Amino acid sequence: ATIAVTGKYRTALKIKAADSTASVKVNVVAADDDEKKLRASNAQRQTNRAPAPTKLVGTAVKPTGPLPDLRSLPAWSISVEDGRYLNFSATVWNAGPSPLVVDGFRQTDNEDLMDAYQYFFDAAGTQVGYSPVGTMEWDRRDGHNHWHFTDFASYRLLDKDKKLVVRSQKEAFCLANTDAVDYTVPDANWKPDNTDLHTSCGGETSIGVREVLDTGSGDTYAQYLPGQSFDLKGLKNGVYYIFVGANPDKKLYESSTSNNNSYRKVTISGTSGHRAVKVAKVGIITEPPIKDEDEDH
């Protein structure tokens, strides 16, 4: 069969006509085989969206079989606020083929911490075991009020030589399928659950929490709060890189860690209290300009 990108999308995405079609092989399978695959897919989705149990299920094992593959998109939606703070959005996504499933269970001696465990599944979606991967912590700040996994991603501002300049204080995250990133990867879940923080991250009285990043989906955070955004005060004008790193302490088990990091080049200019940023283009995508908050001051 031949599939094609329609004209208006070719124009919008600047795709050449010669590159806008592709031939794919279509296999017609017997109903019995198709039903088996559908049952396995549904079983995997049920496993992902089931509420977290109050205790560990299964046995501790060394990871085997399919694993998730965490990757970082280049930082985006970059702007300067109040002439001083470099805001950005960051997305870490799972290229699969396995979902990332992390359960947290409340500690008895510290009510603000949960012990976190990553679950592993075979190709049919059946759980085969788990392994400890750190902790979750209760974040009672306004705008949060949910459980954060503490070793999911990290953000840094690096100089032109990619040496550390500023480190974001945002170190803990609630995992949720906030964005569809690439549903063409093998075993992508086209209809993920837990797509917002309210359904994924538990409450203050939760005994257990299940946080999931499905195959093909990403978790996006906007860094605009002081301490999470980068403070440009005292920094020289020039070239910098916004670093986004997935699984920074490598506590999570995944198929590869070689693709965890991304770097977005930015150029800082202006004077103290009136800084500006120019963002380097990535690939063929042209981002719409973002008005710096300081422009109205």
Name each model-derived stretch.
Residues T2-I3:
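Extracellular or exported targeting regions of proteins
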Residues K8-H297:
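Extracellular/luminal regions of secreted and cell-surface proteins that mediate adhesion/ECM remodeling
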